[in-house]
Curated annotation (Swiss-Prot):
Pathway participation: Protein modification; lipoprotein biosynthesis (diacylglyceryl transfer)
Predominant localisation class: membrane
Keyword Magnesium belongs to the record: no
GO-annotated molecular function: phosphatidylglycerol-prolipoprotein diacylglyceryl transferase activity
Free-text function comment from the UniProt entry: Catalyzes the transfer of the diacylglyceryl group from phosphatidylglycerol to the sulfhydryl group of the N-terminal cysteine of a prolipoprotein, the first step in the formation of mature lipoproteins.
Any Pfam family matching the protein: LGT
UniProt keywords, alphabetically: Cell membrane, Membrane, Transferase, Transmembrane, Transmembrane helix
Gene: lgt
Organism: Thermoanaerobacter pseudethanolicus (strain ATCC 33223 / 39E) (Clostridium thermohydrosulfuricum)
Compartments in which it is found: Cell membrane
Protein name as it appears in the record: Phosphatidylglycerol--prolipoprotein diacylglyceryl transferase
Family membership: Belongs to the Lgt family.
Membrane topology (UniProt): Multi-pass membrane protein
InterPro entries cross-referenced by the UniProt entry: Lgt (IPR001640)
Binding site for a 1,2-diacyl-sn-glycero-3-phospho-(1'-sn-glycerol): 136
Amino acid sequence: MYIPTISPYAFKIGPIDVHWYGIFMAISIAIGGYYLYRQAMKLNYDEDFLLNLLMIVVISGVVGARLMFVLANYPEWFIKDPVQVLKIYEGGLSWHGAVLGGFLAGLYYCRKKGVRINPLEDFAVLGLSIGNILVRIGNIFNQEVLGRPTEFAFGRWPAQLVGVAMGIILLIRYFYIQKKHMPDGYQFWSFIFYYQLMRGLIEETVRDNPLIWPVYLNEKWGIGFFTLTQLVTPFILILAYWMIRRVLNDPNKQFYN
């Protein structure tokens, strides 16, 4: 949805403009991190280990989000204007890069400390779901992640609200799965599977992103295939499904050692 009168700035601190997007992201990180910490403490994880892990995952997630965004959209910056890559305050983050960066850093740290990551990655799902909700709301303030124009009465697909709905569905699903006591690791990989399925089939179809492989475009309906995210969706689904099967077939195994 596009609201031209809305401001992306919540307030100013001296010369610094504080974006609503940043506030929503910080809130989601705080909620997700606190929840993971509290749940992990119930399983007797070491407190210092958890605090260090959270710091490493958050920093690596932000770095991964920025690098993936630049790689997918402006790869020439790495050579022609590397300083631009560092200007994260100007916007431009990738959800997939954030998850990949945070996961790999968390995996490395857990392996270094000899700690099982499977339960921890499951606890991260709540924060990821809430993050999808709040960050998409932040996208509305930033006037980004817009939907494709359409000839339907609403004029443009509300892609950000589609993302909010996805986050709500995944959050409800998280609590439902928690009650079923599935094996460690199932929550995380099934979350990745269903997130990517909805992202590739629904959100990206109505989102105003470039079609890397323009197989189909209906300007009247405002839908199109295939964006970059849609092209990588089958590979992510295969990986997630493979990990789900491994978790279900051998619940007690730590698959990342």
